[in-house]
UniProtKB/Swiss-Prot annotation:
It comes from the Eukaryota. Its main location: nucleus. This is Retinoblastoma-binding protein homolog 5. It holds the Pfam family Beta-prop_VPS8. Keywords: Chromatin regulator, Nucleus, Repeat, Transcription, Transcription regulation, WD repeat. SUPFAM superfamilies: WD40 repeat-like (SSF50978). The gene is rbbp-5. One of its GO terms (cellular component) is nucleus. One of its GO terms (biological process) is heterochromatin organization. SMART domains: WD40. Component of the SET2 complex (also known as the SET1/COMPASS complex), which contains at least set-2, swd-2.1, cfp-1, rbbp-5, wdr-5.1, dpy-30 and ash-2. Disruption phenotype: Strongly reduced di- and trimethylation at 'Lys-4' of histone H3 in embryos and adult germline stem cells. Mutants also display defects in egg laying and fertility with defective germ cell development. RNAi-mediated knockdown disrupts development of the ASE left (ASEL) neuron, causing it to adopt the ASE right (ASER) cell fate. Required for di- and trimethylation at 'Lys-4' of histone H3. Regulates left/right asymmetry of ASE sensory neurons, via its role as a component of the SET2 complex. It comes from Caenorhabditis elegans. InterPro entries: RBBP5/Swd1, WD40/YVTN_repeat-like_dom_sf, WD40_repeat_dom_sf, WD40_rpt.
């Protein structure tokens, strides 16, 4: 059945390199899609943040966010705010549409991770080097430290952290392979468990439409757990529901991403510019994407709704997409390719408005369909863009003036070329002295030029 769907609709994972984003002499360090994949933010090593319109691949905004490399990016739920963290020990929040800085918070050590609350852009979780994660409230300013008060783990610091998809829980991983789950409201630890390894958990990934969480561990194994199973644990060792790893090269993973449904998992190798794609439920390796040799991967992100992956290596953002092959016979089985031009002979009644041989039932149905009223004024939200936990798809409808609601795209003003050269010549010839030949102007006015002036 899967093979039939793949032949009909195509594989839902990237297959080849399509292009590179134009960074305008910048060196990329990390990237992040907004919730719908219409805008992508790219953090650079010089502290700048470039905002791209993903449809046109052009830069819509540029923020001078930090003075050192940007380490992490996070979008708010409505796409109007962008949170950045940097090696300069600070995080910053920007209004994407206005291009203004809203908040900046400085810390005592380098910030490696920052993430908006999935449902509240006034809160964010921040992780510093060798410190416990903190929950930051921007207005009013409140900071709360997530303490590790589990038995026998007082000296363990968190190595990674993330919200679940609804923002009800905070999931933290430690340097000894433990998973801690906090209530996002009370900030109390409600569950903790151990992986079957004591290696450091480097990353926690939560798919947008899945009840699973994925961990990237130092032992080079990518594990998938069901969140509901972890909520009932009190220090027990938990076996992963699915595991994927590189059986041949034993590669370690710099970064891991997944599609919105959690059906595919992509691992970015630390040794080379290679992307490994597995089926998460079977663990079978289905594709390896190879970039240029000698490049080291820094980040990888999967598009929220399309089979597109962005990878960053050596400061360059590469876009991997599907291999599109034209197959017209899939749309019209009777389609035939011609070796040379032929004159087409029209069949009788082929292009008539009414088919005399058609059934009466079909004619009545077509007439009823023509009488249907089509709404061309109101915007109808698409369900496939919403995650599985959406309460109401109408919250995805932006306002017509873009002052409220989700920000799907950034409007760009028209750039009229040679606007200054559109000059109208005045009727009075006295105003043309600067534009015309002086001799011609003097002759038109009835003056005679001396030989020296010629």
């Amino acid at each position: 059945m899967v093979e039939i769907l793949d032949r009909t609709y195509g594989a839902q994972f990237p297959e080849e390199l399509e292009c590179h984003l134009d960074l305008q002499n910048a060196s990329a360090n990390c990237c992040k899609f907004n919730r719908w994949g219409s805008i992508v933010a790219v953090g650079c090593t010089d502290g700048r943040v470039l905002i791209y319109d993903f449809m046109t691949r052009n830069i819509a905004r540029t923020f001078s966010a930090h003075c050192l490399p940007v380490s992490c990016l996070s979008w708010s739920r409505d796409g109007r705010k962008l949170l950045t963290s940097s090696a300069d020990n600070s995080i910053a929040m920007f209004d994407v549409l206005a291009g203004t800085l809203l908040h900046r918070i400085r810390f005592n050590s380098m910030v490696t991770f920052a993430m908006f609350h999935p449902r509240n852009d006034n809160k964010a979780i921040v992780l510093q080097v060798n410190k416990q994660p903190t929950v930051e409230q921007f207005s009013p300013r409140i900071q709360t430290v997530l303490a590790n008060d589990t038995p026998g783990s007082s000296d363990e610091s968190a190595s990674c952290v993330s919200y679940d998809r609804k923002g009800k829980y905070i999931i933290a991983g430690t340097g000894k392979g433990k998973l801690l789950i906090y209530n996002a409201e009370t900030l109390k630890c409600v569950a903790w468990c151990k992986q079957n390894t004591v290696q450091q958990i480097r990353q926690i990934i939560v798919p947008m439409k899945s009840r699973f969480i994925i961990t990237n561990t130092q032992d080079r194994v990518i594990r998938t757990y069901e969140l509901e199973d972890l909520l009932h644990q009190r220090g027990q060792m938990v076996e992963a529901k699915y595991k994927v790893l590189d059986m041949v090269n034993k590669a370690a993973w710099k970064n891991v991403c997944t599609d919105s449904d959690g059906l595919y998992v992509c691992g970015a190798s630390t040794k080379a510019h290679s992307l490994y794609i597995w089926e998460s439920n079977t663990g079978s390796l289905i594709k390896i994407l190879h970039g240029n040799k000698g490049e080291a991967l820094l980040d990888v992100q999967w598009h929220p709704t399309r089979p597109i992956i962005l990878s960053i290596a050596q400061g360059t953002v590469s876009m991997w997409t599907q291999a599109h092959v034209e197959n017209w016979s899939a749309f019209a089985p009777e389609f035939q390719e011609l070796e040379e031009n032929e004159k087409y002979i029209e069949k009788e009644n082929e292009f008539d408005m009414e088919d005399e041989d058609a059934d009466e039932d079909m004619t009545s149905k077509s007439q009823d369909a023509e009488d249907d009223i089509i709404d061309v004024v109101n915007v109808r939200p698409e369900d496939y863009l919403a995650s599985s936990d959406e309460e109401d798809c109408n919250i995805m409808k932006p306002a017509r003036n873009l002052e409220s609601g989700p920000l799907w795209y950034i409007p760009v003003p028209l750039d009229i070329e040679n606007a200054d050269n559109d000059q109208r010549l005045p009727d009075d010839i006295r105003n043309l002295d600067n534009l015309l030949n002086p001799a011609w102007v003097a002759s038109a006015k009835g003056y005679e030029l001396s030989p020296k002036s010629k």
